[in-house]
Amino acid sequence: MRASSPFLTAVPLALLALVAASACGGEPDAVADPLLHREAGYVGSAACRACHEDQHASWAVTHHSTMTQRPSAATVLGHFDGATVAQGKDSARPFRDGERFLMELQVGGVARTAEVELLVGSRRYQQYFERRTLRDGASFFRLPILWHVELHRWLPVDSVFLGPDADGLGGHAAEWNTNCILCHNTGPRPGLLGADEPARLQEGNRFDSHVAELGIACESCHGPGERHVATARSVAKGEAHAVVHPDELDKERAVAVCGQCHGARLPEPPRRAREWFTTGPTFRPGEKLVDHVKPIERGTPVRGGGDPEAFALRFWGDGTPRLTAYEYQGVVASQCYTKGELTCTSCHAMHDGDPKGQLRPDLVGNQLCTQCHEDIGKDVAAHTRHAVDGAGSSCLACHMPKVVFGVADIHRSHRIDNPDPARDGEAGRPHACTLCHVDKSLPWAADAMRRWWGERYRAPQQRFDGAPLDLADAAANLFAGDAAARAVAAVALGEPTATFAPDHAVAVRAWLAVTMGDGWPSVRLLARRSLLAVEQRVGALGVGARAQTVDHLAGVEQRGKDVFGLLDAIAAAARDRSAPAPASIALLGRDYRVDLARVVKLTDLQGRNLIAIGE
């Protein structure tokens, strides 16, 4: 995806550069790395650390700082131990040769060995890139397996996206120079060679790419620092040329700082694409993002051919983003922004708190919202009609539900709005209430909301997916939804906040077991995780060990055996423990066995569209 525009002008005076080096004790840049540049006013985080040691240290522990790295024993997370990873007839064998990290590949009938030159990611999974020379340029290409940090195992790259099973390892190829470079680094300059030729990117383009810094560093958010560093010890103390501080900007410019990456976008006007792929995006912190790019919305036309629905599929039917990297679009569509002064730093802190969420440590739980909504904060239970210390009184659970897919997990929506059962059901969007009350239907949610908050809440006329209205919303999404809806439901069923009546305790496990046979590996992975979580959290049926043995990447025949074996084990355990009889709408018979005929009818309703994430 992209970013964009100019802000701080460089002052290319050697004298000032010398002053800066002596004034701040600047250490030599690591320009020994041929990927690094010092153009357009960028100086690198080492120059910032000389004066801002605390801020540098707090940034260095974030996942922003380790987003892109060179391979080393300290930075590589994957086990390059010589074990083979296979999919179909293809295979990859990661191994080490001294300080080098390599993969022996057999892909599409071609055998070769690739050396890892770049790493992308360090939190949920880590991807690996090789360098290939193309005539007078070079490009970095993604290798076909990645290391999943939580699972502690190798996975085919295409298995973590929203797509069906692949026959081999050749899918989801990506070129770093046209994609990852733009957001996962500081001061990207893709360096497209021959840019005066017809400006259409195609396989075989040559690049001489550089970045100011690998990873997302100080100047990504504060702007190029050359003038600031050069004047840091000016005669009149405190008169150093200022860098940008996002929390001091007006709201439009403040959200743009994060939106340059957390807001999927297109160059605007389109002819600016050539500039993007030569000298890099034009946006600089402190500017308005929309002066440089067009953020992608549900109705944005797809340029240059391709699937005309590609962008629309990245949103729920009401326009709410359902993929990561669209947080900007969610924020600017929220009334907290349009009618208030919400910015990213209202809730997030880049130099404080847990690096995993980077939430402000001075605001705990609902304080993120009650810092503005003070009246509600005085009596939360009166507003929520739930116990004040329960999940039903969580502002985030209701107004920023987990309905966004990305990096092999589900995340919170950044479109802050009110739950609406009619809107959600008719738009195919998972409903906040039934993400906790996983055994309840949308009409049930509408009745409760109408009782508590007025007649404006109603049940949907029909569901977007065509499933019966009286079916639990989670089950309908899990079986009849498209891949994004199924992934959201699979995660919701395993959340600590998920509640269900005793007559659904067996059904929830059975639903997840069936979903472990889903045709899309990313959905199977999440269903497996949730079933194990339910077994740990709720009185165990004793099927956790059996579920643990099911490999979500096994072949279709083996998966079928595993799933039916797991369903048999669930039914037998329920009978042995005299579990409560399943509810009539739970898709189970009195013998605790799944009503497969009804489930198959629901799966026939599934949307089969490929939801292209663009990575």
Predicted regions and their residues:
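Bacterial N-terminal signal peptides that target proteins for export
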Residues: 1-13
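C-terminal motif of bacterial Sec signal peptides marking the signal peptidase cleavage site
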Residues: 21-23
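Primarily the internal scaffold of c-type cytochrome electron-transfer domains
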Residues: 26-32, 36-39, 46, 54-123, ...
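A gly/proline- and charged-residue-enriched helix-loop-helix capping module
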Residues: 159-162, 173-179
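Alpha-helical solenoid scaffolds in eukaryotic proteins
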Residues: 469-475, 507-514
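Core register positions within helices of long alpha-helical scaffolds
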Residues: 492-495, 530-533, 601, 609
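Short coil/turn segments at helix-helix junctions and helix-capping linkers
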Residues: 517-523
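Eukaryotic intrinsically disordered, low-complexity regulatory tails and linkers enriched
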Residues: 586-615
